[in-house]
Amino acid sequence: MTATVNTSDALARLAAVIESRLPARGGDPDKSYVARLLHKGPDAFLKKIGEEATEVVMAAKDADHGGDRTKIVNEVADLWFHTMVALAHYGFSPGEVIAELERREGTSGIEEKALRKAQAREASND
């Protein structure tokens, strides 16, 4: 069930390819799907993220009823890919997401959510 691939390395390689397709780096929308998405702007890749998230849910629901469980992995791969396009557009890397997950490691999800709510309240009171 655990992948034998170094996840961080695979994400870093994919991120480098995606970043090379940014308009500022000469990504050609006629030759690259990623460059085309980026050229169309946030609405295009954000729409894809929404579509892929829905497909993850549908694949999981299908798996619950005897469907092909591997479709979950395929759809999550599509979701991660399009999310990485968004990260690149906004100037972030997968490493920053991993760092945030590591920061949260060992913290209860309930505690983390309560902390974020408290921080939001403090920010709105400023």
Curated annotation (Swiss-Prot):
**Pfam families found in the cross-reference section:** PRA-PH
Q: Where can this protein be found?
A: Cytoplasm
Query: Which Gene Ontology BP annotations are present?
Result: L-histidine biosynthetic process
Gene name on record? hisE
- Pathway involvement of the protein, from the record: Amino-acid biosynthesis; L-histidine biosynthesis; L-histidine from 5-phospho-alpha-D-ribose 1-diphosphate: step 2/9
Task: Provide GO CC annotations from the record.
Answer: cytoplasm
Class of this enzyme: hydrolase
What is the protein named? Phosphoribosyl-ATP pyrophosphatase
